[in-house]
């Protein structure tokens, strides 16, 4: 490999990871789409700002995407906090959800989208019966 090709490779590899733009159609899973009416809400933007540099660590480190949904999809199962975060690495994310939602009623859900891909929801249950928090993806091979 020539020096120029290697330099171009390094430049590409070191580019920042693109952040969530608010366009849910760009997300990697249908399960990460949010209620459209929430995208402009100040609490949604606050949460997006607080988790923008946080990643769920798996074989493919993935960002946490703010989400607001009316109902938990039937495909998802509720899991406990220790199953989602056995080493308490995501305290900052949980705290951001609590602060942005004004609720400490946090629930954890997972769904195996494929044999190698699991989608996680970490959500606060709001007074209006909506769910507000983050979604992310874990990749396991």
UniProtKB/Swiss-Prot annotation:
Q: Which domain of life is it from?
A: Eukaryota
Q: Which InterPro entries match?
A: NuiA-like
- Which Pfam families does this one have? NuiA_2
Which PANTHER family does the UniProt entry name for this protein?
A: PTHR42093, PTHR42093:SF1
**What name appears for this protein in its UniProt entry?**
Uncharacterized protein C21B10.02
Lineage of the native species?
A: Eukaryota, Fungi, Dikarya, Ascomycota, Taphrinomycotina
């Amino acid at each position: 490999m020539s020096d120029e090709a290697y330099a171009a490779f390094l430049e590409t590899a070191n580019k920042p990871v693109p952040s969530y733009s608010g366009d849910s159609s760009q997300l990697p899973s249908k399960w990460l789409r949010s209620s459209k009416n929430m995208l402009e809400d100040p609490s949604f933007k606050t949460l997006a700002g607080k988790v923008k540099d946080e990643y769920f660590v798996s074989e493919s480190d993935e960002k946490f995407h703010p989400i607001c949904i009316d109902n938990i999809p039937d495909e998802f199962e509720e899991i406990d906090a220790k199953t989602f975060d056995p080493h308490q690495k995501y305290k900052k994310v949980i705290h951001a959800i609590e602060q942005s939602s004004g609720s400490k009623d946090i629930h954890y859900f997972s769904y195996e989208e494929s044999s190698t891909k699991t989608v996680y929801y970490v959500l606060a249950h709001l007074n209006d019966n909506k769910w507000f928090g983050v979604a992310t993806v874990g990749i396991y091979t």
